[in-house]
Amino acid sequence: MLYYLFDYLEKLQLPGARLFHYVSFRSAVAIVLALLLATVIGNRIIERLRKAQIGETIRDLGLEGQLSKKGTPTMGGLIIIISILIPTLLLARLDNVYILLMIVTTVLLGSLGFLDDYIKVFRKKKEGLHGRYKIIGQVGLGFIIGIVLYMNPAVVIKENSEVLRDGQVERVHFNKQEVKSTKTTIPFVKNNNFDYADILPLEGKTKVLFGWILFVCVAVVVVTFISNCANLTDGLDGLATGSSAIIGVVLAIFAYVSSHIEMASYLNIMFIPGAEELTIFAFAFVGATIGFLWYNAYPAQVFMGDTGSLTLGGIIAVFALIIRKEMLLPILCFVFIIEGLSVMIQVFYFKLTKRRTGEGRRIFKMTPLHHHFQKPGNAGIDAWLQKPMQAIPESKITVRFWLVGIIMAAITIATLKMR
């Protein structure tokens, strides 16, 4: 909104009004504003949640310090959502299709998570919203994102190709024409590009249609999987919040370089016109998560609940799809994914061994993976992996997972220059 106001003021030749035309300036304002909003309104929202007795119910899993969390306010994801949306609405261009998709993602998954938390708190159902309804919401969002990216005429890219001399890359050339494309960025392949339409040996319109059908299916899987993995990661104070902030920084960098033709040329990635506005959203996302971490760090004064975790995961997934970096998520979202996979592997192995031997066995002492490190090796749990033998304090597990996230974020950026 402020963009349009200052655009009008610039026409009146108001000194300094042109600043709002610079994405870098608006991004800087966005992160500061989001950070201030999260810290200032966060305290007030926490007090209201506490007075309304909107507290977390805790199951006794035998974890150190677990029962002390009972009654801690939940639904704190509202702080994150508000702190993302207000800077975005004020500073970003609202005629940009990518910004509109991110706003829809934030509101839709925020509402889905809020409904889940509401059922847990007020209807006293620990399982919350039935899993099938969560999946329907996530699949529906992924389908919407895929279809909009397919059908909206503003969603285009400029394809890149290498110009070689003596077998060496001399420069990267961008085609003048902006095209609809099912290409995505992936390291270790020619031009760092991979086209979904090339999977099957098809030609013409059939090939194009197949590429978009596959892209929509990938969008559905990515949104559903990453949002659920983020939800499972939110089990230790500050873990999901800090990990999301790290991922958000990388996504902000990707959005900026993808919309800057010289930087895109240097990194040999596709140029995406209009993606620069996503930088503002990403900085608001980072500011909101860091601000929320002020209250969510150990010992947490508030939990984000599904209101926050589903939203964070969905935002990361949709953002990556828009800037065509979804194939980098296994590296960038490594912490989220190993948390989710640990649960899937545990359930699969338990059911498999129970069917074969009549007694279910475990690989990990407890899942998601962060709980495995909270359990000592002599806890009497029959699990294939018993190390570490000593329980690790919650705060140390969180910091170590953050460090892993930072390392994987650096590797993600580095892959763009690998040939």
UniProtKB/Swiss-Prot annotation:
A Pfam family hit: MraY_sig1
Function: Catalyzes the initial step of the lipid cycle reactions in the biosynthesis of the cell wall peptidoglycan: transfers peptidoglycan precursor phospho-MurNAc-pentapeptide from UDP-MurNAc-pentapeptide onto the lipid carrier undecaprenyl phosphate, yielding undecaprenyl-pyrophosphoryl-MurNAc-pentapeptide, known as lipid I.
Enzyme class: transferase
Primary gene name: mraY
Cofactors required: Mg(2+)
Keywords on record: Cell cycle, Cell division, Cell inner membrane, Cell membrane, Cell shape, Cell wall biogenesis/degradation, Magnesium, Membrane, Metal-binding, Peptidoglycan synthesis, Transferase, Transmembrane, Transmembrane helix
Protein name: Phospho-N-acetylmuramoyl-pentapeptide-transferase
Record flagged with keyword Cell division: yes
Pathways involved: Cell wall biogenesis; peptidoglycan biosynthesis
Recorded GO MF terms: metal ion binding; phospho-N-acetylmuramoyl-pentapeptide-transferase activity; UDP-N-acetylmuramoyl-L-alanyl-D-glutamyl-meso-2,6-diaminopimelyl-D-alanyl-D-alanine:undecaprenyl-phosphate transferase activity
Organism: Porphyromonas gingivalis (strain ATCC BAA-308 / W83)
